[in-house]
Amino acid sequence: MTQKADATRRFLLKGGIAAAGVAAGSGAITGFPTIWAQNIKNVTLRQFGTGVSALNAIASKCKEDTGITIQMTAMDTDAAAQRAITQPRSYDVADIEYFTVKKVFPANVLQPLDVKKIKFYDDIVPLFKTGKVTPTASIGQGTAPCRVSFVEGETSLKFAGAPTEWMTLIPTIYNADTLGIRPDLVGRPIKNWRDLVDPAFKGKSAIINIPSIGIMDAAMTMESLGTMKYGDKGNMTKPEIDQTIAFLIQKKKDGQFRAFWKSFQESVDLMSSGEVVIQSMWSPAVTAVRSKGIQCVFQPLAEGYRGWGGGLGIAKHLTGLERDAAYEYINWYLSGWTGAYLNRQGYYSAVLSTAQKNMTPNEWGYWMDGKPATAAIVSPDGTEIAKVGDLRDGGSYYDRIGKIACWNSVMDNDRYLVQKWNEFSVA
């Protein structure tokens, strides 16, 4: 998914990253005695996470509906994982990505979450439980969320091989990433990951400069070329890392890459200007380019997508009223408004049934069912992003999520990867 704080803005909303708690508004909540519920309204929860979901609009709506104040702080993925581990008393709720759970949860800073307290647990998509959205779908290589979703018990730090009553995070958001292209400038159909390094696009392609994600895009490209076959792209051996980095360095020396971007806005600017015609990209960045009236496609590719997901965890130190408020917040989060809000940006929500109730049939048809828009599609800030008759790139939910080939990961050789990636960066 992300890095760099301004770099993590994978969304179109102006002023979307939350910097502070929201104090206005209130609303009734249910499920607690009156006095208890009134006390919960006085609770402030400190949450940190990436810019994908650390959004003022979510905190504001939560305050309006539940009375709970959420103080949000946005940061990049690596900083979020580091804070979770090294400053466990500085937050109450951790909004982190699943691939970082391999680092964070064994540090004993988050508490296993009781699924019996999650109102919509049974409605959470199976991707986070069994790993498959359909019986025939593959789970994909790397740190698929289901591999780190559960622990063996209430006090356990050991990941469970199958669903238990204790989750590491309650899932909230996920997506399938691919290459972004300028169809008006590439001059031919784009069908494969190997097109990223086609000499025809020399000096006009770009790759994300985040080791854990860029290496995946490179691996998808090399397998597409037929020059490498990985045992597990999400957990490479040192020789596999060496070969992948050597490939990237050679392509860099050949002048293939125009840029190595870290931020959402960088990727938008590169594509909007036409400096780059094919690159690693995020769905809302494609939307941002389109909102300028410029053709841009989030291109489905034959080899599949790279997946990522995130969720909410509760700090180990949280107890009593504050912990109950955190569970209430999570239950509110899954109740539909937030899911619809995220879906409208091109992400997917963990509980589809409640999100659907907060979307129009036209919105649901466009974003989820792969149907042509019957009216203009607008983002949460009102920007028109699709016209009547337009289709979402990649088709339906099942077409996209069912074709994830690998997931963002923390490799066993992560430190070695970062070292080698730095060699590529300065080459």
Feature-to-residue mapping (PLM):
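N-terminal secretory signal peptides
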Residues: 1-11, 34
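N-terminal export leaders
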Residues: 7-25
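Mature extracytoplasmic/periplasmic domains
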Residues: 37, 315-393
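Early extracytoplasmic/lumenal segment of secretory-pathway proteins
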Residues: 38-107
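Extracytoplasmic ligand-binding site segments that recognize negatively charged/polar headgroups
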Residues: 53, 105, 110-266
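Alpha-to-beta junction loops
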Residues: 87-95, 109, 201-203, 273-278
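Extracytoplasmic/periplasmic substrate-binding proteins
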Residues: 256-319, 356-359, 363
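Conserved C-terminal helix/tail region of periplasmic/extracytoplasmic solute-binding proteins
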Residues: 383-427
